[in-house]
């Protein structure tokens, strides 16, 4: 019985470690998406302060291609929406993993109390 308890303890501890790593990765992805969204919003604000006749360029790989300001704004707004959706999805994932971590910690505490 003791061997099974040790094995269950180590498996639960490993699961807790894996879940914690997953949660940290998701938090990093949330931060990256939020930073990208902020950059897009700043760029949109800067573009709106320019006159409509100003030539604008879009980065394509290592080169820049002339692009109408309206299409740049549209692409940036779409990117902002995509980033917001990504953040919402990632927040849901983090809540789910957080609940799993809580459950796993509870199981780990029960195993420790058993001994």
Swiss-Prot record:
Subunit (UniProt): Heterohexamer of two PFD-alpha type and four PFD-beta type subunits.
Transmembrane segments: none
One Pfam family hit: Prefoldin_2
Gene: pfdn1
Protein name: Probable prefoldin subunit 1
One GO cellular component, as annotated: cytoplasm
Gene Ontology BP terms: protein folding
Keywords carried by this UniProt record: Chaperone
Organism: Dictyostelium discoideum
Gene Ontology MF annotations: protein folding chaperone; unfolded protein binding
Task performed by this protein: Binds specifically to cytosolic chaperonin (c-CPN) and transfers target proteins to it. Binds to nascent polypeptide chain and promotes folding in an environment in which there are many competing pathways for nonnative proteins.
Membership in a protein family: Belongs to the prefoldin subunit beta family.
Lineage: Eukaryota, Amoebozoa, Evosea, Eumycetozoa, Dictyostelia
Domain of life: Eukaryota
